[in-house]
Structures are given as structure tokens and as C-alpha cells.
Amino acid sequence: MTFQGAFTALVTPFKDGEIDQDAYRELIEWQIEQGIDGLVPCGTTGEAATMTHEEQGEVIRICVEQAKGRVPVIAGAGSNNTKEAVNLTKLAKQAGADATLQITPYYNKPTPAGLLAHFKALSEEASMPFILYNVPGRTGLNALPETIAMIANEVPDVVGVKEATANLGQVSDVIEQCPEGFTVLSGDDFTVLPLLALGGHGVISVVSNIVPDLMSGMCAAYRAGDMKKAQELHFKMQPLNRVMFVETNPIPVKTALGMMGKFETSFRLPLVPLMEASKAKLEAQLKASGLI
């Protein structure tokens, strides 16, 4: 299976502290109706760090069930504990996910040899396609292009990378050094179009939670050779991208979906509601963009 185009890093609706299954299914259905190319449950945006393993398995299962094979599902299943990552990956595999998103182990800052050993263990104990997730702003570790290329060459289950550095020089080096057919997805909504121009394949997106049609449309326009339309959609999304990060993700995007009437805005600690000043900025931009 190839992974290209716009994948939404899905938020997880909560109600009374529990997963709101009905709202989650409705969000997934709306995403598919709006033309999204794929779904990513249990990532950073999905507040997976606040869930039990059982809850993560449930969220992935619901996503796979609701998608019904219409779009691929890449399930977040990473950890800084290799054994835990193996167990989460097995849960995702049992739930029917097409691949998993594997964050580079955070906090303990493994060496390149440690990263390779981590992904080899994952492949040996829970074999399925993996997308490596490089997000140094959250992990404290930047997997350099030569490290990603080493892992890609030595661990065949690692089929791609979500590059969230927003460093186009680094993205270019990853594309240059990794094997042919290795998928490179943006983890930064601001630089999706230039990443595509370098030879990347798509994005795992935050803003597509609220505008799946625009993000998938931009990726499709680029693939069709319509650069003018792709540029128009890029600039149409940029103001929304800015307010999506006015505070820590996923607080703004989840608040936006609440303003759009998709579900009740609720977070699990340590995340708290958007500050009033930020909420005013978000509301103004959603109105300016015609979303509310």
C-alpha cells in the first residue's frame, strides 16, 4: 500500500472524561466525505499520551471500522519504551490498521545505533509497515537524514517518515539518501507544498481536521500538475495554520472543531482549554475563512 496525499492527524473527542465514540465516528465519516486521503488516530493531536493502552486500541479499532477500507489508517503506536511500542503496535495490528506511526523514542535520547535497534526489535516482534516520526520539538532528538536512511535500508518494515522539523534542507537530504519508494510525509502544515516539490508524498496534518477538502485538494492539485491551484490552496490555509498553533496542539484545533459544532470541546489533563485571548483570535479567523 502506498501512502500519499493528505492524512489527518485525528483529534479524539471526549465527553465526561471518556472517549465520545459517536462524535469520533461522525468526524471520521465527515473527513472521508470531504475527500481526505487517509487517517491517523492516536497521534500527538489525538492526545494518545493521555490514554490507556486499552483506550488506544479502542480508538484505533473505531477508526478502522468507520473507515471501512475506504482510506488507509496509520495508527499512532510509538513509545520511548521499546517493549511498550511493541505492545501498542500489536494492538494496532489486531485492530486492522494499515501501518503504524512510530515516534523516535523521546526523553532517553538514544544514539543512532539505539534507534536502529529499537526499530529492528519492533519489526521482529510486531511486523507491519511503520512510518518513522521525527519531531525533535517534542522528543528532544533529531533523527538526522543519514540515521533515517540507515534505518530505512536495514529495516524493511520502515516504509516512510513523517518529517516534522520544517527544515526543507533536511527533508531534501532525507529524500536524496533514502531508498527509492521510501515515503516522505510532512509533519508541518506550513511547508507541505515545498516538501511535495522536493519529491515528498504528502502530509500528516493538523489543520485538515477542520479543512480536509483544502489540504487534500492541494495535494491532488500538485500531483495533477496544477501548481497555480496548489499555491492558491496553500495560501488559503496559511492563516488557519497560524491559529492552529496559537497555543499547544491540539488545544486550538479541538476548540475550532467545537466552534464548528462537531463535538463538545473537552481535554484531558495536563491540557486545558484555550485562553480567552487566543480563543478570540481563533474565532475571528474561522469566521474570516467561512468555517463558522
UniProtKB/Swiss-Prot annotation:
Pathway assignment: Amino-acid biosynthesis; L-lysine biosynthesis via DAP pathway; (S)-tetrahydrodipicolinate from L-aspartate: step 3/4
SMART domains cross-referenced by the UniProt entry: DHDPS
Positions contributing to pyruvate binding: 45, 204
EC id: 4.3.3.7
Pfam families from the UniProt entry: DHDPS
Record's catalysed reaction(s): L-aspartate 4-semialdehyde + pyruvate = (2S,4S)-4-hydroxy-2,3,4,5-tetrahydrodipicolinate + H2O + H(+)
Protein name, as recorded: 4-hydroxy-tetrahydrodipicolinate synthase
Species per Swiss-Prot/TrEMBL record: Maridesulfovibrio salexigens (strain ATCC 14822 / DSM 2638 / NCIMB 8403 / VKM B-1763)
